From Swiss-Prot:
Localisation per UniProt entry: Cell membrane
Protein known as: Putative ABC transporter ATP-binding protein PYRAB03730
Family, per entry: Belongs to the ABC transporter superfamily.
Protein's job: Probably part of an ABC transporter complex. Responsible for energy coupling to the transport system.
MF (Gene Ontology): ATP binding; ATP hydrolysis activity; ATPase-coupled transmembrane transporter activity
Keyword Membrane among UniProt keywords: yes
Location of the ABC transporter domain: 4-244
Length: 280
């Protein structure tokens, strides 16, 4: 069952002559973990903004096509209504945090929606425990680490109980520890909470291991999609458009070029076995 359906979507920002998205068609299944990759300026972030209605409702430009989220056409429903179905997390957590305590940050959206107090507290406790920030609920958000800030931004979206979580390069400004904290949380949300994940991420090693499907953007278009092992087999094409190749695929590709293997996408066990054969 598709939870998101994108039909012939194109978009051009109001002050631009060029389209940021061109004829994008894409379906996302309920419960799927979808990874999105592409060079800078390829339309990835713009695509994310179409999924919760910020485009076309809040961002000026020319929008063509339709996006359906959980059966709702984003043209016909407000961003507030869509936010209970799609949560959006940006690169910089500071752009989403503006309250005095962690607790107030997570409560903010629920108060605006008029959620009953008992239900509000139940959701807040659930979300903060899930992202491992319950013990820091009285902290001033700017005092948190980068990884903690991003987890707080995720919690502030999770309390809305969205069926889909869209994360636009959530680890790009984090140190290695912060990246691991956030990506571990993303895995948990998909596997245990059954939330559909759409993750724009430069960490292709992570996507190769954990995504169900990869979509490649270039020039505002979807130029490739498939299972991770299928997509990353196209090493030369991905390198040509500026995609970082996962470590084990790089090794496998070198073996393939030397005629040692037929595939570039190999497990580390397969790589070790092939190298061992050559050393005998």
């Amino acid at each position: 069952m598709n939870i998101i359906e994108v039909e012939n979507v194109s978009f051009k920002y109001g002050n631009s002559k060029a389209y940021s998205l061109r004829d994008v068609n894409l379906n996302v299944k309920k419960g799927e973990f979808l990874g999105i990759i592409g060079p800078s300026g390829s339309g990835k972030s713009t695509f994310c903004l179409t999924l919760n209605g910020l485009i076309p409702h809040s961002i000026n430009g020319e929008f063509e096509g339709n996006v359906f989220v959980d059966g709702l056409n984003t043209r016909e429903h407000s961003v507030a209504e869509l936010s209970t179905r799609v949560g959006l997390v940006f690169q910089n957590p500071d752009s989403q945090l503006f309250n005095m305590t962690v607790l107030e940050e997570v409560a903010f959206a629920l108060e605006n929606l008029g959620v009953e107090r008992e239900e509000m507290w139940r959701r807040i406790r659930w979300a903060l425990k899930l992202v491992k920030l319950w013990d820091k609920r009285e902290e001033f958000p700017p005092n948190l680490s980068g990884g903690e800030k991003q987890r707080l931004a995720i919690a502030s979206v999770l309390v809305m109980k969205p069926k889909v979580l869209v994360l636009d390069e959530p680890t790009s400004q984090l140190d290695p520890l912060g990246r691991e904290e956030v990506l571990s949380l993303v895995r948990l949300l998909n596997k245990e909470e059954k939330i559909t994940i759409i993750l724009v991420e430069h960490n292709t090693d992570f996507l190769l291991e954990h995504a169900d499907r990869i979509v490649v953007f270039d020039g505002g278009r979807v130029v490739m999609e498939g299972k991770p092992e299928e997509v990353f087999e196209n090493v030369e094409f991905l390198e040509r458009i500026g995609i970082r190749i996962p470590t084990r695929v790089k090794i496998g590709y070198e073996l393939k070029k030397r005629g040692i293997t037929r595939r570039a996408v190999l497990s580390y066990e397969e790589i070790i076995a092939e190298i061992a054969k050559q050393l005998r």
